[in-house]
Swiss-Prot record:
Residues 43-58 have a biased composition (Basic residues). This is Small ribosomal subunit protein bS21. GO terms for molecular function: structural constituent of ribosome. Belongs to the bacterial ribosomal protein bS21 family. One of its GO terms (biological process) is translation. It holds the Pfam family Ribosomal_S21. HAMAP family: Ribosomal_bS21 (MF_00358). PROSITE patterns: RIBOSOMAL_S21 (PS01181). InterPro entries: Ribosomal_bS21, Ribosomal_bS21_CS, Ribosomal_bS21_sf. Keywords: Ribonucleoprotein, Ribosomal protein.
Length: 58
């Protein structure tokens, strides 16, 4: 979990902005979206294969 300590004379907005940035950098939101619904292993393999194919042809 990301943790941000509010500095002296720092506004809440800037602390919140730093917190959001640290969450995005650590990949918390992406992980939450990925785990939101169960995905069968066969579907995971298919998506991974499709992504590799798209990268190859770009």
């Amino acid at each position: 979990m990301s943790e941000v300590r509010v500095k002296e004379n720092e506004s809440l907005d800037s602390a919140l902005k730093r917190f959001k940035r640290s969450c995005a950098k650590s990949g918390v939101l992406a992980e939450v979206r990925k785990r939101e619904h169960y995905e069968k292993p066969s579907v995971k393999r298919k998506k991974k294969s499709e992504a590799a194919r798209k990268r190859k042809f770009k």
